[in-house]
Amino acid sequence: MKGATMNNNKKYNLNFFSMDDSFFTRLTRIRPNDILHIFKFISAWPIACIYRRLRRHLWLLCEYETEARDNAFYLFSYLREKQPQIDAVYAISHRGKDFYKVKSLGEVVEYGSWKHWLYYIAAEINISSQKGGKPNAAVCYALEVSGIWKNKRAFLQHGVIKDDLPFLHYKKTRMRLFSCAAKPEYEFVRDTFGYPDNYVRYLGLCRFDILHTVQADPNLILVAPTWRNYLYFIKGTPGNQSQEFLSSDYYQKWDSLINSPQFLELIHRYGKRVIFCPHRNMQSYSSLFICSDPAVSILPWEQADITDLIHQATMLITDYSSIFMDFAYMKRPILYYQF
């Protein structure tokens, strides 16, 4: 299930996403490491106003800082291959292992750089699969949601919504386009999230286009639990956080599954392999999961390409991660392990 977004290396300033705050209240929540981005924004603004005349129809796309594996990447790939006349640029850090994959397709800009700000301000439209996909989420949020700075932003999403998510309501985003993948989802978001007419569109997920062509490994099972808000925001020292996580029902249930003698016996009987890959928001605890059986691999998110795993796995075991939609789309079996 979809929840608060997070950078691949650090948590966003999620205090920004409270309801009905004034512009000045949001400003007080800007952290010291956000201050540099305020100066980047101020210095890039006048130049961007001129630069916009040179590139009137610039489309800027991005996802996470170091990744290109979701809907924004698949849209960028399509644009470069099928619609090269569109002036599309992708923002990604050179430190990401997907950097050269994107660079081979077209122009890239360093994520969070001054040039990223220049392009973000000058762009005709900013497109992302993440709500926080921008040079600096805190600064942009304060300016955009307060109405100080008006721009066009398209939200491609990275899953399918099944619940009311207040942080995605229009008054919390001011996004101009909100793409949905399923008819019931589209109707729910349109009627519940408060967007003006025609801002919510039934367009599908870009990454679904490739699902028609991928071939599964018949022996690979993906175990992919989603995250829990109460575990993501555990306070205290790392040691205290680990102890609280170890005592949680979440850890104990998933640990008991991957170490279950009955489960492992079935895996070996049918010659299967299991990859256990918790949601990125649980990755700080992934090292606490241990299984000595060679048929089970514990895969930290930073080592995983979740898109490849979705393509390769012949079966999914999850609680309610929205990637079950991908498996349903491919008509592959899904086993729900819920507690």
Model-derived segments and their meaning:
Residues 92-98, 279-283, 321-322:
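Short, polar loop motifs at secondary-structure junctions
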Residues 303-339:
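A donor-sugar binding/catalytic signature common to diverse glycosyltransferases
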Residues 70-76, 80, 206-288:
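Conserved catalytic-core segment of nucleotide-activated headgroup transferases in glycan assembly
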